[in-house]
Amino acid sequence: MGLETEKADVQLCMDDDAYSRHSAVDFGDLEQLADSGSDRDPRRLNSHLQVGFEDVIAEPVSTHSFDKVWICSHALFEVSKYVIYKFLTLLLAMPMAFAAGVLFATLSCLHIWIIMPFVKTCLMVLPSVQTIWKSVTDAVIAPLCSSVGRSFSSVSLQVSHD
């Protein structure tokens, strides 16, 4: 409770190599990953998107188009699917990845700094609220229900068939 005259010396030492490894995104292996042709969906999030020509276009046995038309339409389907997909990913992939990153960062921040502290606070306060609610129920609602029950228990009905 007295006046403190001591000085507090605090030093923070940080290794530059350890700091750079853990705080930044490592882009060193991205070019190798893109060139290696590795599996870009290792958890099979989009395994249901196996869309081929036969999944979309099918001719029954009784009605077949000319073979050249079938071959050309199959080739046109595959080429257009490939070109349009490449064009759309070129146009939309980076903005959508940025938007998804911002969304997930926002949701993570809200979950960590707002939702979980609120839930923990509610769980901390809940036993007190439960005790108060039980007291109110025992003091007000239970006697009221008991007296209403006693009043209606003395009522008797007799039905006669005339």
From Swiss-Prot:
Residues 1-86, 108-162 are cytoplasmic. Pfam families: Caveolin. Residues 87-107 dip into the membrane without crossing it. GO terms for molecular function: D1 dopamine receptor binding; molecular adaptor activity; protein kinase binding. Belongs to the caveolin family. GO terms for cellular component: caveola; cytoplasmic vesicle; Golgi apparatus; Golgi membrane; nucleus; perinuclear region of cytoplasm; plasma membrane raft. Monomer or homodimer. Interacts with CAV1; the interaction forms a stable heterooligomeric complex that is required for targeting to lipid rafts and for caveolae formation. Tyrosine phosphorylated forms do not form heterooligomers with the Tyr-19-phosphorylated form existing as a monomer or dimer. Interacts (tyrosine phosphorylated form) with the SH2 domain-containing proteins, RASA1, NCK1 and SRC. Interacts (tyrosine phosphorylated form) with INSR. It comes from Canis lupus familiaris (Dog). The modification Phosphoserine is found at residues 20, 23, 36. It is found in: Nucleus; Cytoplasm; Golgi apparatus membrane; Cell membrane. The modification Phosphotyrosine is found at residue 19. InterPro entries: Caveolin (IPR001612), Caveolin_CS (IPR018361). May act as a scaffolding protein within caveolar membranes. Interacts directly with G-protein alpha subunits and can functionally regulate their activity. Acts as an accessory protein in conjunction with CAV1 in targeting to lipid rafts and driving caveolae formation. The Ser-36 phosphorylated form has a role in modulating mitosis in endothelial cells. Positive regulator of cellular mitogenesis of the MAPK signaling pathway. Required for the insulin-stimulated nuclear translocation and activation of MAPK1 and STAT3, and the subsequent regulation of cell cycle progression. GO terms for biological process: caveola assembly; cell differentiation; endoplasmic reticulum organization; insulin receptor signaling pathway; mitochondrion organization; negative regulation of endothelial cell proliferation; positive regulation of dopamine receptor signaling pathway; regulation of cytosolic calcium ion concentration. This is Caveolin-2. Phosphorylated on serine and tyrosine residues. CAV1 promotes phosphorylation on Ser-23 which then targets the complex to the plasma membrane, lipid rafts and caveolae. Phosphorylation on Ser-36 appears to modulate mitosis in endothelial cells. Phosphorylation on Tyr-19 is required for insulin-induced phosphorylation of MAPK1 and DNA binding of STAT3. Tyrosine phosphorylation is induced by both EGF and insulin. Keywords: Cell membrane, Cytoplasm, Golgi apparatus, Membrane, Nucleus, Phosphoprotein. It is a peripheral membrane protein.
